[in-house]
Each structure stands twice: as C-alpha cells, then as structure tokens.
Amino acid sequence: MNPQKGVNPTQNPPFRQVLIDESTQATEPECLIPLVMGCKQLVLVGDHCQLGPVIMCKKAAKAGLAQSLFERLVLVGVKPIRLQVQYRMHPCLSEFPSSAFYEGTLQNGVTQSERVQAGVDFPWPVPTRPMMFYVQVGGGRG
C-alpha cells in the first residue's frame, strides 16, 4: 500500500478475511495489522496453552509484548472454540496433550491402522510404538 499512489488501505482493504494460524506465537501488534489495514473478519487459530510469542527484550516482555492477542482475548472472557478431533499425530502421541491440556477430550480422527501408507516397506523397529530414532553414521555427502 503506497500512500503516494493515493491508496487508502482502510477504504480498500487488500483482504476482507484474514486467518492467522499459530496466532498464539504472534505478538499482539502483528495480529492487529490486518485490522488496522481494514480487514472485516480476523480468525485467530492457536492454542494459548502452548508456546507464546518469543520476545528477546525483557523490557518489552515485561511491558506485555509476550502475551498474544489470542491469550488476551481468552483472559477477558472470549471463549475460544476448542479442537475436538486431531489428525496430525499418531494416536499414542496424542494421549499426553489430550490428558494434560484437553481434559482427555481430544479425539483422534485417524486410527493407528489407518496411518499405515500402502506401498511403504520401511521396516519399523517396534510397530506398536509411534516413535523411533534413526542414526546414520558416515556415508553423507560433504
């Protein structure tokens, strides 16, 4: 938006709707930019129980910059819509966040058996465990 060209972003907003993913990791000023630019609907997606904005300056953090707009809205009583079904993690991995942060209500949208890809013949070390560490020593290209 070049003010020299006579464009007023509040009269002609570049976007009517804006969705900010991981908004709990963004600072308040970052999340306010779309509103200042005139967007009509702002959707904040995130989890205020997870990592917030990373602020390196202690003075700025103490002044409130370490709190996201999402968290501030939750603290003043705006009720967020909670994730109910997750598709990202293996069901065994989702057990911890479900019990620790979601009172055991987080459901899995994909079962363990549905996560197996057809045609992938990687020999998984322990099929009942969703994690492994693979260490490759040498043989890399330099």
Give names to the regions the model predicted.
Residues 1-142:
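Conserved helicase motor core of SF1/SF2 NTP-dependent helicases
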